[in-house]
């Protein structure tokens, strides 16, 4: 029971302001979470990241940005050599930016299932609501509803 205490302590509450952070994307370009961000997508595993990729398949470049959405991928468990030599270079072909949490500084702030994509809906930097998506179809539908 005590082992669950850290998860409870980290749980986000509606109305809570998200602490700003800065991560590098797959092009080593910095991104800082700001009040303009309306949707934060968090993937804690390769399977969850693949859901995002499938949901964004065939979408034009700038699709997430037009929706004021940001995608964070937790890649801390990926061996650094694999990330550097193969995974991150492959991500450069994506039509969307991926904020890479290489050291687990950001994704653990937002508790959720490892195999699902966490959707945090924000307004002026505060959490309005959150959802988890287990399929690419569900995530795609939600993104389509988040019209620019």
What do these predicted ranges mean?
Residues 70-72, 87-114:
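Short, internal strand/loop/helix patches
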Residues 7-11:
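Boundary at the C-terminal end of the N-terminal hydrophobic targeting segment
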Residues 1-6:
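Bacterial N-terminal signal peptides
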Residues 32-50:
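Short active-site neighborhood of thiol/selenol oxidoreductases, capturing the structured segment around
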Residues 34-35, 102-138:
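Thiol/disulfide oxidoreductase modules built on the thioredoxin-like
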Residues 20-37:
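A short beta-strand-turn-helix
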Residues 48-90:
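Structural microenvironment flanking redox-active thiols in thiol-disulfide oxidoreductases
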Residues 136-148:
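A short, polar/charged loop-to-alpha-helix boundary motif
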């Amino acid at each position: 029971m005590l082992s669950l205490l850290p998860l409870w302590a980290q749980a986000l509450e509606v109305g809570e302001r998200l602490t700003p952070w800065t991560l590098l994307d797959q092009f080593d370009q910095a991104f800082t979470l700001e009040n303009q961000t309306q949707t934060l997508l968090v993937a804690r595993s390769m399977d969850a990241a693949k859901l995002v990729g499938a949901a964004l398949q065939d979408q034009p470049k700038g699709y997430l940005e037009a929706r004021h959405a940001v995608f964070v991928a937790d890649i801390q468990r990926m061996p650094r050599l694999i990330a550097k030599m193969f995974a991150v270079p492959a991500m450069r072909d994506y039509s969307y930016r991926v904020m890479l949490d290489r050291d687990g500084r950001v994704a653990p702030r937002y508790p959720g299932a490892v195999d699902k994509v966490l959707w945090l809906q924000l307004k002026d930097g505060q959490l309005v609501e959150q959802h988890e998506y287990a399929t690419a179809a569900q995530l795609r539908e939600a993104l389509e509803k988040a019209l620019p």
